[in-house]
Amino acid sequence: REISMKILCVSLGCDKNLVDTEMMLGLLNRDGYNFTDDEQEADIIVINTCCFINDAKEESVNTILEMAELKKTGTCKALIVTGCMAQRYQQEILEEIPEVDGILGTSTYDEISNVLKRVLGGEERVSCFHDLNCLPQTETGRMITTGGHFAFLKIAEGCDKHCTYCIIPSLRGSYRSVPMERLVKEAEQLAEQGVRELILVAQETTLYGVDLYGKKMLPELLHRLAQIPGIYWIRIQYCYPEEITDELIEAIRSEEKVCHYLDIPIQHASDRILKRMGRRTSQAQLREMIGRLRREIPDIALRTTMIAGFPGETEEDHQEVLAFVDEMEFERLGVFAYSAEEDTPAAGFADQIPEEIKEDRRDEIMELQQEIAFEKSESMVGRVLDVMIEGKVADEAAYVGRTYMDAPNVDGYIFVNSGELFMSGDFVRVKVTGASEYDLIGEVYDEFTK
């Protein structure tokens, strides 16, 4: 037990990767390591990488190179690289960055302690990769890094969808659900640590259970999680539109703790492009599904993501997207300019779109969404909502919080004017008094609802 050793963990990329980082922190904590946020005093640096799109790849490479320098200038004795980039570019990283001492794939992060022991014991260039389709064992509790009052619960790993632009199946393997009992136990541990909001994540949450139980079990999982004392909000992200069932809609509607919020990445609205993307929905099906959600759960907040400038996208296709966004009026929308990823079918399509056009189209969609978001925000004025307090605004009698419509890190906030003392994680009733494009302003209507 190297008790005196200090570890810095750098987590890049998505919330699913963050869960893996928190799992590794839990294992390292169990084995007696200390932690630091200061790269200058770290004895060991672990970088959990991302390479989903080119920008993420660059960030991962730059972070590795930056931290590699600390082996010369700082106290760093061991540099370990994990995650998606390690999975994809194992050979290149070992060949081109000699400072890297250990490397682990996406399905072996539970080996972090063993790899560290081997590295600290003098073994060079330790490499740990198992079958991509195994599920790491995570009986040890996680160390929460999100501030304590919300946590991501990763309910499945991998993906079987094989969209033509996406490398996730080759980085994360085939779809495999985490057994329900294990998830319930993990959620109970999180609640005991003070977590009040669970955010369910996976590459695709709506298929949960199909591989283990022979049918979709997300509704059943929601019912089980809703019974855990101390959990007040359950939020679902990464839903595939074609997998949303009547049972799921009913579970969202009937379980009080499940937020009336769904993140449903649709990626496009032109049938021609959806087909080229390998997506399994048509515009008509998307329209029907969104209409059904709005009818069944009138106050639902819908978030989606779209890709602008996919290979072969014409101006006509782009106009279809704009018309669809205008008609559907999503509460939340993120748009990415298409990024060609090597080894994906779409990267080999002949009709790639120039960078400038991709960015112009992305900006055009976002400008339209900004108008929609402002109208949506303004329509909230006068409503009274439960707000989870995130923290205090420095030097002001005000707090920052989130409503059920806001997932952390990706959506907006509500600024709550109050001289009273609230703690992060408190739920407060707030009357909305004003709005900007993506954020709301309000005042305390009735304190401490939960």
Could you tell me what each predicted segment is?
Residues 348-450:
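Terminal RNA-binding accessory module
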Residues 79-83, 88, 93, 192-316, ...:
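Conserved SAM/AdoMet-binding glycine-rich loop
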Residues 202, 238, 266-268, 304-308, ...:
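Active-site proximal loops enriched in glycine and acidic residues that flank catalytic Cys/His/Asp
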Residues 7, 44-45, 151, 198, ...:
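Conserved beta-strand core positions
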Residues 51-52, 172, 212-215, 275-281, ...:
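Short glycine-enriched, charge-decorated loop/helix-capping segments at active-site entrances
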Residues 97-98, 119-122, 216-218, 252-254, ...:
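Short, hinge-like loop/turn segments at secondary-structure boundaries
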Residues 2-208, 247, 262, 284-291, ...:
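Proteins enriched for Cys/Gly/acidic motifs involved in redox and nucleic-acid/cofactor modification
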Residues 183, 200, 236, 264, ...:
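Conserved, mostly hydrophobic/aromatic
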